[in-house]
Amino acid sequence: VALCIGLSVYAATALADDPFRPEAGKFPPLEKAHSYRGELVFVDHANRRGSLRVEGTGKFYRNDPHPFAMLPYGIVRYHGAPADLRDIPLGTLMHVRAFLPPDPKTSVVPVLPVDSKSKDAGHYRGTGIFPAENHVLLLEDEPSHCLREGLVWKLREVEIHNGEGTITATRAPAQGDAPKAVEDMMTFDSATRIWRGSERIGVARMVADAAWPASGKKKLGGQPVQLGITWKPAPGDGLGGAFTRFHISDIWLDEAAIEQAAQFQTETHKAFIRGRWMPAWVDAVEYGKFGRATVTATLFGGMDASLYADFQKGVQAQMNGAENTLKHAGGHYGPGHIASNGRITAITQADGKIPLGSSGIQIQFETDLIIEGIRPTRVIRVRPQSWPSRQVPREEYVNDSLEERFPTPAIFPKY
């Protein structure tokens, strides 16, 4: 008996110590994700992967690009709106919530030791720059992060010489203040975009309006704004000065300005999803006779509400197999050529808290000819017939090769 109890305790302890990995068919809890941020330096948009220069404890410019992959239900946000990786300019500072690879054997990016984030990378790079948690649930730029968290940047002081300089600011709750907020000093220059309402202005206009001095310093009194943040190499030999100093690409001076930016990005993403179809995964399949089937699927989250509104009971639709990269399974004559045709017979909205990655919307789809790729836990794409039937470019669908279905991590340099 004592031996059995001992083995049970050991097994329970071992299970508790096992690192968390997302499972197929389940949306992982956001609170179990590892958080970090870094500069976007490479994008393979067709395979939903790329590299970030992750901020650690050392000199930022020395940090090697760190590969990441989006989970199939992973969400990208830019300017406070849904986005695709192709929408994000290189150099943008991104906030990340990520997990260990769900299945290391099929990871499209290099798999690292679980404790990588705690190891000192050496060469003045410090710790934290190579997290093993490189499968991303949420990837968002600075204004998206602040809007989601209810934060703003409060400008404290500007210093300007010859049209460029630095801004000192604190990130704090939009309502109230953060007594222990740490001041950040960031650079700007004449290329920094400044948005006021629907108008784009620049540094020269801020000087002309006497909002900023022509030269020297000025206190700004905690003016609340949203900032777009990037990174650019700083002057000097890298032996001294600030280890990490970020650069301001955009300043949104008021709510109208950031709302307009979000609206433009929303329209860009809506057009993209209508052309590529809504991603989802299969919860269950009930097979009938002679190829007939009823498919229950959950639509992925993070899209504009108007896209979900197009999924209505009784509408005709198409459903196609897809990979974890969201690539269509075949598309020589368009993804609709081999997709299952049918209609949506039921729509269910989940109650309670919806996990990030899920829309909470479940559809039932009846077809008289189900294709191979539509199986439980598999990723699919689905299109209401009201959406346009379009071709997709060659890099966005798979053919017969294993390399296209399971992209290798070998494209990433070993620094």
Task: Give the positions of each predicted feature.
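Short, flexible, surface-exposed loop segments at domain boundaries
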Residues: 9-73, 78-415
